[in-house]
A protein has these predicted regions:
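Polytopic alpha-helical membrane proteins, predominantly small-molecule transporters/carriers
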Residues: 1-110
């Protein structure tokens, strides 16, 4: 597997995490079958692809990227879908997450 392939798998894992967590609210405590099934399948795909990405990428880089991009994406879903407007401290924190993800990936020797 190449480094590019590992990052593609990581991107799929991130998409799975975003779909899974994004549908979690719609599951209504896993009482609604369709959103629950989507949530479970998405997280299974996420974990499977992330485990393969970790064959090449260091665990710290993989997890930092996965969680950082997921946090940003889900925060944007919260803003646009649920009208959850972040305050200044939250916005600063989100900007720092983006900076951190960029730094760990550009300074990575993998």
């Amino acid at each position: 597997m190449t480094l590019t392939q590992a990052y593609i798998l990581l991107a799929i894992a991130i998409a799975g995490e975003i779909i899974s967590t994004g549908t979690l609210k719609a599951t209504d405590g896993f009482t609604k079958w369709i959103p629950s099934l989507i949530c479970i399948l998405a997280i299974a795909i996420c974990m499977y692809t992330m485990s393969h990405a970790m064959k090449i990428l260091p665990i710290g880089i993989t997890y930092a990227t996965w969680s950082g991009v997921g946090i940003i994406a889900l925060s944007l879903i919260g803003i646009f879908k649920y009208k959850q407007i972040p305050n200044l401290a939250t916005t600063i924190g989100l900007v720092l997450i983006v900076i951190g993800v960029v730094i760990v990936n550009t300074m990575n020797d993998a």
